[in-house]
Amino acid sequence: PYMRYIEAKLHEVLPSRFYIHSGKGLEELNEWVIKGKFEGICTESDYEAFDASQDQYIVAFELALMEYLGLPRDLIEDYAFIKCHLGSKLGNFAIMRFSGEASTFLFNTMANMLFTFLRYNIKDSEHICFAGDDMCASERLCIKKEHEGFLNKLKLKAKVFFVDKPTFCGWHLCPDGIYKKPQLVLERMCIAKEKNNLANCLDNYAIEVSYAYKLGERAVNRMDEEELEAAYNCVRIIIKNKKLLKSDILGFYSNIEKQI
């Protein structure tokens, strides 16, 4: 409940031009991206060894946040103790983010936001989306030197890309909305077929592929030859196996089949 409280407080004060992809549907992401007009040169950021980079400075930030939000003192002290005293028969572990920790996604996202706001000169026009260690901004962000000294102390190091076809969590972002990377969906479909597991995940893949199909030429014009071929094969596989579809997306692909 405390982690849900922290998340609720974060969303309570988050400006609408910032987006956290947690507990949100794809339609919400799509509408937000359309408002953000992701066109021209955008900024993508990824991190080197993100979980291993969550050092003592990030823990200090988390503890300060919990104190500010009024969480129980014993809970905060227990969290600090666990973070500083994990070990094995070989010795103590360095402070980092371990799998299975409480609210890993939320704290990773906040660390990502903290780094972004300290590293870049944020104005009032950018739309920026965050999810764990993923970040994408609707404009080319300018680096500021104001906090350079502190940022150099962090193990957290960003790999920054300035791109005209921005992506976020496997989705292409454009002024017309979102569409999933076709090669990514096709590869997952092929793996599911090999494992004889297509029936359990085809609905999800069909929903993802539908976003590109709905955009039509607006998506096609942004795809290269490899992406177009992958998108075609995705639709073909879904239609050939549409008897496996269980959700409302079945009607969408039935209409496509009639048009073909």
Curated annotation (Swiss-Prot):
It catalyses: RNA(n) + a ribonucleoside 5'-triphosphate = RNA(n+1) + diphosphate; ATP + H2O = ADP + phosphate + H(+). One of its GO terms (molecular function) is ATP binding. One of its GO terms (biological process) is DNA-templated transcription. The keyword Nucleotidyltransferase applies. Pfam families: RdRP_2 (PF00978). Its EC number is 2.7.7.48, 3.6.4.13. It comes from the Viruses. Residues 40-147 form the RdRp catalytic domain. RNA replication. The central part of this protein possibly functions as an ATP-binding helicase. Belongs to the potexviruses/carlaviruses RNA replication protein family. This is RNA replication protein. It comes from Chrysanthemum virus B (CVB).
